[in-house]
Amino acid sequence: MIIVDTNVVSELLRPEPEPCVEQWLSRQDGQTVYLTAISEAELRHGLAIMPAGKRRTALMDAVDHILREDMAGRILPFDSAAAQSYAIIAAGRRAVGRPIMQADCQIAAIAHAHGAPVATRNTPDFEGCGIDLINPWNAE
């Protein structure tokens, strides 16, 4: 299981995604790639604040396809186990003077509860959370 951060999905939605991200994803077993409900919320929020128009409509269709088809059955909720991990991660980061954004902490907590790594461009945001990190922008 690998949990992809919101920025990985956002990259794939760009008109010209970074080839390294596409290549990294193509090397993964699709059934082992997961998303969190937090990332779903971030994607949907980003679309909701976009101006109405063709671009927004096209991106909404693409995101709906990803969520309903590509990631069907592989969107992880923020549950009680994640809530326990959240408390540990947030307190630990605060104790060392590195507070973490709520959404990042929720994603990290879901990954921690599942023993899964997070694939993200923003690895510093997730350091010190007790999870493994993968950066598809510079993965071998």
What do these predicted regions represent?
Residues 1, 108-140:
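Acidic, PIN/NYN-like endoribonuclease modules and their adjacent C-terminal/linker elements
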Residues 1-39, 47-66, 140:
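Short, well-structured N-terminal submotif of metal-dependent ribonuclease cores
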Residues 7, 20, 84, 105-106, ...:
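Active-site phosphate/pyrophosphate-handling residues
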Residues 9, 40-43, 83, 126:
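A generic structural signal for short hydrophobic patches within well-formed alpha-helices
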Residues 11-12, 24, 46, 86-89, ...:
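Residues that scaffold the ATP/ADP-binding catalytic core of kinase and kinase-like folds
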Residues 28, 71, 129-130:
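Short, structured coil segments at secondary-structure junctions
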Residues 45-51, 69-117:
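Active-site neighborhoods of divalent-metal-dependent phosphate/nucleic-acid chemistry enzymes
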